[in-house]
Amino acid sequence: MNVLILCTGNSCRSPMAQGFLQSFNENINVYSGGTAPAAQVNAKAVEVMKEVGIDISLHVPTHVNEYLCQEWDYVITVCGGAHKSCPIFTGNVHHHLHIGFD
């Protein structure tokens, strides 16, 4: 199963969601991206995830365009900005979900 999680900066919400989802099932391919990626992952996000035993310190914010041509079982937006401005994934996405953490 391929899952893409999107937010605006790909520095906090989507990498955290990626870390959690990947920790639930290592057989799921989980990726995350942003519509306007930050320069680096948010230090507080790394700290909070470390508290629950999940390491996202090596995450590199990635632009959503890197994933446009791939097939996805789920594309999940986790902030209103990404939900409104993320590109259309016609034909390559089986399910779209919006779970806002604004």
Task: Please report, for each region that a protein language model flagged, where it lies by residue.
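Alpha-helix C-terminal capping/helix-to-coil transition sites in glycosyltransferase folds
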Residues: 69-71
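Phosphate-binding/catalytic loops
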Residues: 83-102
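Short glycine-rich anion-binding loops that position phosphate/pyrophosphate groups of nucleotides
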Residues: 11, 80-83
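Conserved active-site segments centered on acidic
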Residues: 1-65
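Short, hydrophobic beta-strand segments that form beta-sheet elements in well-ordered domains
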Residues: 73-79
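Structural signal for conserved beta-strand scaffold positions within catalytic alpha/beta enzyme cores
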Residues: 32, 77, 97-100
